[in-house]
Amino acid sequence: MHSIIFKAAVALLGVSTAAGFSYQNSRLCLKLLAQGVEVDLPNSTDYETEQQNYWSTACTALRPDCIIAPKNARDMSRAVAAIQESKTTRFAIKSGGHSPNQLFSSIHDGVLISTRNLKQITYNEHTQTAVLGPGLKWEEAVGGLKDKGQTVVGGRLGGIGVGGLILGGGLSFLSGQYGWATNNVVNFEVVLANGTIVNANATSNPDLYAVMKGGSGNFGIVTAFTVKTHTQDPEIWGGSMFFDGNHTESLTRAIRDFAEYNTDDKASIIGTVNRNPSLIWVVFLTYDGPSPPEDVFRNFTQIPNIRNTVKRQSYHSLMLANDEYIRHGNRFSIGAETSVNPSGTHGYDIFKSFIDHWNDVTDDFIDIPGSASSLALQPLPRSISTKAKESGGDVAGFDPRYDYLLLQIAVSWNSSTSDSVIEAATRKYYTVQGDMIKQFTNEGKLPKAYCPLYLNDLNANQDFWGRVAPSTREKALAVRRAVDPTLFFQNRVTGGFRLG
């Protein structure tokens, strides 16, 4: 062990000198290595492998002074204690690395805590729960429970990380039946700012438990989630259908009507319109059963398509297939807004204005080499918000009296030289989109309703907590003051939607 630490010290000192890395952070890394915590040093194979495991290459480009990879809650506690002692070290926490926002799960001139070794899957048949590690991808979590005939409420693309998705709410193909992913958590194992390991659930630390459901990483670092499991049919019906842009009116009407009229909680859709540079629609259709009733998706299936991958398959297979749509090797920017689902009277005109605005924004950058743009139109039927409330609620707290529409732009491009243009366009998208929704509301075309934002879809510069109900935000602040009175996570974690 001593020889390993000596070699590591030499390596770190060399890197610190060559790259300007912090000497203090290097000492912190060596201290944890001496305590038996796994630490990756710059230029090592494990370090470089971890760095490649991001969705956006803009995050890959950030270089931490070292990567700490705890294997259990005790290791995580040691890491937190060491960072506390350093006084100034800043850090980021990584689950799946899917957020394209720089500094959320990536860092430069600081240390990265990777949860890659926290990949436990422990099923309890008696309680119908499973313990999941935050380092899992959803395809691993679902695949690990497949032979038990069980599944969990989680990501719709298999390559997304468990930790980040749950802490941000987590929309799922199963949400119509069971609410958000975070509503299905029965216990969080958490390392607090003082290094204490606690459990947060309905009876132990219940206030902490309540605000961690969709409150992101403001209160501690989760080392294990205990989640409800649900019986899963061997086969479900799902896949995607592709349409050319000539069917935009029919598709937007179908999406709007699905949000209002669908009564089958096993049915779920995602509508996306894409420019690269021509206009193509991709609609994800999922039914949690071997075959949907004929009328559930009729408004979509009757539109002529140019490609159709929908079939009977396992839920796990569907998640793996959906990974096809995770574009790799590019930089990414995202931004989002929330609208109440418009009525049939104004629905198409409002949807058209939303798509026209996205098209106008896309015109600002679509000639940049390697650029592409998509707009997701995600219906959020009131059944999801109802199930969420029945399960104890969550921080966002969408109002179950309304059907909502979640809108998200996602932009990809190749070179950092175009960053400022893309980020300006993304900001223009969500700022003007928000103004449009306010205008439609003032004109009486949309009802005046509480419209929180979906945290996992947001740009780093958006104000998640500013759109949360004031009473919920005050409750979250009270918990933060109790568990992190020195603002450790608020001031020392580089990214995320900080509560204050």
UniProtKB/Swiss-Prot annotation:
Keywords: FAD, Flavoprotein, Glycoprotein, Oxidoreductase, Secreted, Signal. InterPro entries: FAD-bd_PCMH, FAD-bd_PCMH-like_sf, FAD-bd_PCMH_sub2, FAD-linked_Oxidoreductase, Oxid_FAD_bind_N. It is found in: Secreted. The modification Pros-8alpha-FAD histidine is found at H98. Its cofactor is FAD. GO terms for molecular function: FAD binding; oxidoreductase activity. Gene3D superfamilies: 3.30.465.10. Its EC number is 1.-.-.-. Glycans are attached at N43, N194, N201, N246, N299, N414. Residues 1-20 form the signal peptide. One of its GO terms (cellular component) is extracellular region. Residues 60-232 form the FAD-binding PCMH-type domain. Belongs to the oxygen-dependent FAD-linked oxidoreductase family. This is Uncharacterized FAD-linked oxidoreductase ARB_02372. It comes from Arthroderma benhamiae (strain ATCC MYA-4681 / CBS 112371).
